[in-house]
């Protein structure tokens, strides 16, 4: 059985020799293991062995979020059903958001039909605590067009948008929990660690891609704890000074104490802007509102949710949503995170 490990802490992009050495010692990534297994299932003999093994070792299988399943996930569900296990799959086609990860929600109906699943629809949600929020969700699912009531961001518990960029443009009283969807860039990862210190200070919650930033920088858990006092000092500097170039240099020096990644010698305008955005929010006297995208908000709930939508997204909402469009499903998820009320936060209210 191959062992699965995280990317080596000293290699942001491991070379071929390192990969071959790791594989020869029985180490691989989770994705490597999935790829090998998926390929092996194409061989009839292997499928038979897996089916028999499932029948011998398991009685039942419960799969949540089935509409986020990729090809391998669906293949295993099929095998479990063929092996005679009691298989239950749970999911909402309106909340399938992970096509970029290989999810295949369009294949789920065929799976449940071919495997003769009995469908039981759930019509009650314990999230809604107000009739209007329950009505909004029902009408969205029915494809009815919507014009949301407007409200200021300050009265909401969270602001949700479909893109991180929209959240950073939402004003100094909104603090998004990420800069963008990836932290593969070294300096982007360093800025994410500073952002994470701010979000922990303000919301008791780490930045969305905090763990990814540590991996990009090759920083272990223990090293991250040693680094925190330096990062907290940098946050204090951002709050008290407008010299972000000086803060950038201090950030580079701090991160260099715990990583051997090659840090840039000159500041890039994008990363200076990142620090300036944080500085502006730290000096803001009003309550900060956390900002999340629909992807990060999925599965969570708040009492009052504000949404920031583009003109094009508002136009789509007025026409009505369709479950077969991922962009429409993102809007549905954003608009159904509130227990009591969802409001549109227009640009002139930010």
Question: Each predicted region: which residue ranges?
Answer:
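The feature marks helicase ATPase cores and/or their adjacent C-terminal helical subdomains
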Residues: 1-350
């Amino acid at each position: 059985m191959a062992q699965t490990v995280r990317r080596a802490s000293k290699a942001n992009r491991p070379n071929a020799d390192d990969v071959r050495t790791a594989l020869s010692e029985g180490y691989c990534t989770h994705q490597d293991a999935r790829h090998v297994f998926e390929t092996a299932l194409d061989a009839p003999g292997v499928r038979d062995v897996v089916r028999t093994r499932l029948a011998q070792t398991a009685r039942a299988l419960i799969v949540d979020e089935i509409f986020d399943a990729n090809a391998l996930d669906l293949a295993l569900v099929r095998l479990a059903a063929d092996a005679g296990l009691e298989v239950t799959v749970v999911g909402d086609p309106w909340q399938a958001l992970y096509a970029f990860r290989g999810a295949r929600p369009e294949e789920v109906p065929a799976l449940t039909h071919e495997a003769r699943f009995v469908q039981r629809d759930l019509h009650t949600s314990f999230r809604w605590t107000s009739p209007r929020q329950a009505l909004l969700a029902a009408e969205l699912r029915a494809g009815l067009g919507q014009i949301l009531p407007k409200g200021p961001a300050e009265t909401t518990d969270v602001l949700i948008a479909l893109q991180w960029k929209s959240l950073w443009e939402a004003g100094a009283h909104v603090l998004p929990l990420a800069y963008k969807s990836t932290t593969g860039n070294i300096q982007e990862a360093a800025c994410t660690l500073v952002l994470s210190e701010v979000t922990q200070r303000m919301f008791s919650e780490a930045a969305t891609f905090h763990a990814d930033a540590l991996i990009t920088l090759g920083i272990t858990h223990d090293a991250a704890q040693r680094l925190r006092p330096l990062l907290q000092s940098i946050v204090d500097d951002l709050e008290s000074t407008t010299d972000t170039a000086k803060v950038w240099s201090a950030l580079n020096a701090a991160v260099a104490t715990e990583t051997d990644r090659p840090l840039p010698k000159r500041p890039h305008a994008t990363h200076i802007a990142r620090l300036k955005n944080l500085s502006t929010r730290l000096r803001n006297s009003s309550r900060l509102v956390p900002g999340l995208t629909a992807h990060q908000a999925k599965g969570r709930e708040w009492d009052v949710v504000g949404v920031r939508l583009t003109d094009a997204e508002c136009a789509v909402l007025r026409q009505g949503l369709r479950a077969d469009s991922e962009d429409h499903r993102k809007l549905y998820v954003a608009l159904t995170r509130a227990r009591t009320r969802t409001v549109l936060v227009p640009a002139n209210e930010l």
